[in-house]
């Protein structure tokens, strides 16, 4: 059996909004399509997570003896978001995303290095 760990934000949590923008989890429905005797999935995705939160989760799992054959990583939606209230208050100011591009790249690379060492 292969062990797969999933790290990411709400996209990898299989979270989908309905017409009223209420979020629903669909991971059990998706996983039911795959034979459980071949793949064991541990989903560590968190709603609202950024790449920094992901690195913390990977480091925590590694310290506890992470046993993954594969890891799926997907961050960026929350990292690239902006403080929209600040933008509305001062549209002419220099506004940056929650995570700057270089910080995102370095943090993702650190996450991959932790996983490679496992």
How would you label these PLM feature ranges?
Residues 11-12, 49, 77-80:
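Short, solvent-exposed loop/turn segments at secondary-structure junctions
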């Amino acid at each position: 059996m292969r062990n797969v760990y999933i790290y990411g934000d709400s996209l990898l949590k299989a979270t989908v909004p309905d017409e009223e923008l209420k979020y629903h989890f669909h991971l059990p429905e998706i996983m039911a399509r795959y034979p459980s005797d071949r793949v064991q999935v541990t989903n560590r995705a968190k709603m609202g997570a950024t790449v920094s939160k992901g690195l913390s989760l990977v480091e925590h799992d590694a310290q506890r003896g992470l046993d993954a054959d594969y890891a799926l990583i997907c961050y960026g939606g929350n990292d690239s978001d902006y403080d929209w209230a600040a933008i509305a208050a001062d549209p002419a100011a220099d506004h940056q995303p929650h995570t700057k591009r270089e910080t995102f790249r370095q943090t993702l690379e650190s996450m991959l290095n932790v996983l490679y060492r496992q």
